Amino acid sequence: MTIVWSPTAVEDLEHLRATIEQYNPRAAAKVARAILRRVESLAEFPGMGKPGRIPHTRELVIPDTPFIVVYTTVEQTVKIVTVLHTARK
């Protein structure tokens, strides 16, 4: 499957990295890599996330981080909708 990031998801990832980087640049890079690696695995395993709170979405927990990736699947495409901090509702 092809992975496509929405503009919102790209902005979310950039924002969280910039925020973490203010306090710990190494941690910011580590978190961004963890998110990107986990998202890449959706190409082979698009059903690995749990059913989302919003209809027709799935939520992928990023291990060892407080982040969740919300995504949808349509035909052969996984669309990354947003990246959320678990404290956000």
What do the predicted segments below correspond to?
Residues 2-57, 74-77:
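Basic, Lys/Arg-enriched alpha-helical interface segments
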